[in-house]
From Swiss-Prot:
Cofactor, how bound (note): Binds 1 FAD per subunit.
Source species, domain of life: Bacteria
Enzyme class per UniProt: oxidoreductase
GO cellular component: cytosol
Compartment(s): Cytoplasm
Sites where the protein binds FAD: 35-44
Keyword field: Cytoplasm, FAD, Flavoprotein, NAD, NADP, Oxidoreductase
Entry's family note: Belongs to the class-I pyridine nucleotide-disulfide oxidoreductase family.
Function: Conversion of NADPH, generated by peripheral catabolic pathways, to NADH, which can enter the respiratory chain for energy generation.
Enzyme Commission code(s) on record: 1.6.1.1
Catalytic activity: NAD(+) + NADPH = NADH + NADP(+)
NCBIfam families: PRK05249.1
Organism encoding this protein: Pseudomonas putida (strain GB-1)
Protein name: Soluble pyridine nucleotide transhydrogenase
Length: 464
């Protein structure tokens, strides 16, 4: 058994692990990375964010071709199979792996491929694919092993018609009708993707409103858009059992309803990847979803062991995970890079996409904050008209007395890009966070960014 000594060992090479390893390495620490896949990138690169967003991009291109009258001169609308569309995602994955492999090499991070588990509080044993066991001793260890889809024991996920958000990428045909159980972020994103391919989608939600953490107006806009695009949303429903057939699947609901489709995609929650870490050897406990509890410094109950990313739960975003990993390493190296990641933009890649940061109207009303609203509808924006993307809006919430920006919410074309302008101004200290910034700033024309000026004028016009 080979033995190696490090300052920091990171378990998992997803966004959180990468952020942790890079920050520790750049601070001069000797760092090792352990991942159970034979390529770096984690589930984010191989099964989650990257393939699903590449898939979404391809579907949007197909939708644009099929709905833009200009293209009728060269042919009728065309439909592509799911496996054919998925091929574009595979190219992006390989490019991402190559880039990230280069990051670790340039920063002299040693990468071990194999299953890592705790022998004790300062030792990780890695079982390599060839069966060789290597021992890594470390002063500090960061757990960034991510998550996987939650699988209830009473559902047969080995049935060829039943999928989760990982296995759906192996779908070898295009279903005519698909049941998506779970209307969270992942469920809504995949509902959009399959709807864009012409698939009839039944989206089953166990709550009364889609993505209830969003501003209610944005959530309602998404619901309306879904209803116009072959997506039937069934609220306040819970499954009783899933019946797999040779030619499809039947979802039995507790309300007595039954839904039949060609396939079922399970998108109801995720579980932390902690079951193979040997946490019982070091006294770290996990909750019912396999997640680790950490403090504001991302430290677990064992002082030299930290956690970051999906494995610690909220907010379970790749963007936040990277910052959490970087901050966990910052707590170790004490180079001023630590911060508690709590106010991050939400990016939801439905079609159209959604993004937001800060407070929503429900929260401000409940807190009795005197706020006002400014809106810009994309149907009136020149850039949106040029792009043929008239659906959507930008919504700014601001304090009616100080003009401080309290929240930014966007639904539509380039929403995940647009939100960062508002984020930058909201992060300015004191009186520099002010709605008038958007009135006094010159925006390129035509751009989607100038929606901020339109929304700012709309908000100021509401004051009296």
């Amino acid at each position: 058994m080979a033995v190696y000594n490090y300052d920091v060992v990171v378990l998992g090479s997803g966004p959180a692990g990468e952020g942790a390893a890079m920050n520790a390495a750049k601070a001069g620490r000797k760092v090792a990375m352990v991942d159970d896949r034979r390529q770096v990138g984690g589930n984010c690169t191989h099964l989650g964010t990257i393939p699903s967003k590449a898939l979404r991009h391809s579907v949007r291109q197909i939708m644009q071709f099929n709905t833009n009258p200009m293209f009728r001169a060269i042919g009728e609308p065309r439909w592509f199979s799911f496996p054919d569309v998925l091929k574009s995602a595979e190219k992006v994955i390989s490019k991402q792996v190559a880039s990230r492999t280069g990051y670790y090499a340039r920063n002299r991070v040693d990468v071990f491929f194999g299953t890592g588990s705790f022998a004790d509080e300062q030792t990780v044993e890695v079982v390599c694919p060839n069966g060789v066991v290597e021992k890594l001793n470390a002063k500090h260890i960061i757990i960034a092993t991510g998550s996987r889809p939650y699988r209830p024991a009473d559902i047969d996920f080995h049935h060829p018609r039943v999928y989760d958000s990982d296995t759906i990428l192996s779908l070898s045909h295009t279903p005519r009708k698909l049941i998506v159980y779970g209307a969270g972020v992942i469920g809504c994103e995949y509902a959009s993707i399959f709807s864009g391919l012409g698939v009839l989608v039944e989206l089953v939600d166990n709550r009364g409103q889609l993505l209830s953490f969003l501003d209610s107006e944005i959530s309602q806009a998404l619901s309306y858009h879904f209803s116009n695009n072959n997506i039937t949303v069934r609220h306040n429903e819970e499954y009783e059992r899933v019946e797999g057939l040779d030619n499809g699947v039947i979802l039995h609901l507790k309300s007595g309803k039954k839904i039949k489709a060609d396939a079922l995609l399970w998108c109801n929650g995720r579980t932390g990847n902690t079951d193979k870490l040997g946490l019982e050897n070091i006294g770290i406990k996990v909750n019912s979803r396999g997640q680790i509890e950490v403090d504001e410094a991302y430290r677990t109950t064992v002082p030299n062991i930290y956690g970051a990313g999906d494995v610690i739960g909220w907010p379970s975003l790749a963007s936040a995970a990277h910052d959490q990993g970087r901050s966990a390493a910052g707590s170790i190296v004490d180079n001023g890079s630590w911060r508690f990641v709590n106010d991050v933009p939400t990016g939801i890649y439905t079609i159209p996409e959604i993004s937001s940061i800060g407070k929503n109207e429900q929260e401000l009303t409940q807190a009795k904050v005197p706020y006002e609203v400014g809106k810009a509808f994309f149907k009136g924006m020149a850039r949106a008209q040029i792009a043929g993307e008239p659906q959507g809006m930008l919504k700014i919430l601001f304090h009616r007395e100080t003009l401080e920006i309290l929240g930014v919410h966007c639904f539509g074309y380039q929403a995940s890009e647009i939100v960062h302008i508002g984020q930058a101004i909201m992060n300015q200290p004191g009186e520099h966070n002010n709605l008038k910034y958007f009135v006094n700033t010159t925006f390129n024309y035509p751009t989607m960014a100038e929606a901020y000026r339109v929304a700012a004028y709309d908000g100021l016009n509401r004051l009296f």
